[in-house]
């Protein structure tokens, strides 16, 4: 039986970052129908100055069969089930979800599980089930939605199996890969096999572009967060079923373990991704209603700046370009930020805006001429 989570971790740090939603180059237009569509990136972290986690080192042994690999690694993969409580019209509703995870480290009796952010996003209750059938209360330690990586911890006095992390940079196209996970949320421990089809695939996942491994290994909903292993029994990828089109056979994706490991280690040590840039702005999206043939086009404008925002931004600015890159969507905005490091000097072009009111409506009008300035990117999460 699942245990209800009675409380969150002892020290919870919630870091909220409002990102932009899309952009347009047109000016002197009235914005109307502003949408409630802010994009927030949240890290939740029981951050205590960096945990000392023990990992398993590799011995580079190549197994002769799939059965031998599965025997060596299957116990490192766990099932994750979640419950999310929502309230609507004074009533509470509980939604259930399921995915997979891989045990990758231990500190004392605390085991560290890597999974996808979308597996546990919004969950009020997390249950982890091992291959042997033991169930544990899971606590969310840290998460990053742009990397789609989350860390869940469990406490166990039993000795649990820990996956060996491989080197995804050394993968060869065509080599055999084995996926183990919980497809459909009810078939835990399912094993499928395929080959590595490609590396370095740039795949859009919602409002971000991720660099992923491509495989023809069968992956279904519930596999998310599970392990992708090579024939050495090394974890070389974290399965991402969210990017895998169920209508297209033989094309599935996973996060390279080298990328996931960097995110994992930074979240453990700092509580955020070291070097990731942000402007710390509260931004919304709206539609242009008039001017220069621009009616119906979408713009991004700043609804609020705060003491921690990057310098020189002003409320109601329409963000037009970042380091010369035109911002036409939230994807463009996040891509531009991903090309910047915290502490970098950045050139930004905006159109200054101001509130415009009439008898019938109110909105925001923008200057006819743009304003260009330089600012220094902030460290995301600080």
Which stretches of residues belong to each language-model region?
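Serine-dependent protease modules
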Residues: 26-289, 338, 366-368, 376-381
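C-terminal recognition in membrane/secretory proteostasis and scaffolding
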Residues: 2-42, 139, 172, 230-232, ...
């Amino acid at each position: 039986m699942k245990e209800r989570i009675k409380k969150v971790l002892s020290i919870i740090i919630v870091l909220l970052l409002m990102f932009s939603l899309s952009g347009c180059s047109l000016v002197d237009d009235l914005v109307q129908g502003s949408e409630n569509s802010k994009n927030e990136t949240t890290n939740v972290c029981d951050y205590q100055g960096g945990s000392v986690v023990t990992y398993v080192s590799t011995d580079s042994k190549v197994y002769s069969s799939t059965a031998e690999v599965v025997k060596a690694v299957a116990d490192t993969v766990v099932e994750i089930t979640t419950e999310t409580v929502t309230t609507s019209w004074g009533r509470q509703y509980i939604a259930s979800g399921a995915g997979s995870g891989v045990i990758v480290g231990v500190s004392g009796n605390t085991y560290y599980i890597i999974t996808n952010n979308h597996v546990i996003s919004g969950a009020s209750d997390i249950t982890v089930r091992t291959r042997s059938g033991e169930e544990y209360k899971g606590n969310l330690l840290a998460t990053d939605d742009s990397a789609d990586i989350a860390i869940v911890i469990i406490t166990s006095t039993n000795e649990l199996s820990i996956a060996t992390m491989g080197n995804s940079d050394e993968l060869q196209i065509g080599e055999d890969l084995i996926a183990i996970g919980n497809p459909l949320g009810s078939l835990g421990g399912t094993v499928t096999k395929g080959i590595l089809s490609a590396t370095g695939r740039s795949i859009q996942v919602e409002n971000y572009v991720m660099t992923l491994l491509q495989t023809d290994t069968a992956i279904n909903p519930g596999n998310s967060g599970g392990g992708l292993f090579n024939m050495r029994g090394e974890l070389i990828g974290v399965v991402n079923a969210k990017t895998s089109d169920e209508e297209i056979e033989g094309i599935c994706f996973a996060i390279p373990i080298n990328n996931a490991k960097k995110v994992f280690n930074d979240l453990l040590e700092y509580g955020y991704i070291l070097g990731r840039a942000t402007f710390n702005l509260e931004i919304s999206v709206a539609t242009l209603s008039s001017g220069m043939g621009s009616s119906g086009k979408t713009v991004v404008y700043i609804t609020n700046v705060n003491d921690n925002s990057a310098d020189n931004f002003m409320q109601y600015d329409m963000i037009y370009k970042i380091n010369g890159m035109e911002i036409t969507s939230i994807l463009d905005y996040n891509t531009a930020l991903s090309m910047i490091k915290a502490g970098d000097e950045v050139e930004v072009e905006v159109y200054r805006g101001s509130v415009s009111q009439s008898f019938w409506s109110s909105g925001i009008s923008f200057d006819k001429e743009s304003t260009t300035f330089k600012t220094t990117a902030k460290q995301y999460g600080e």
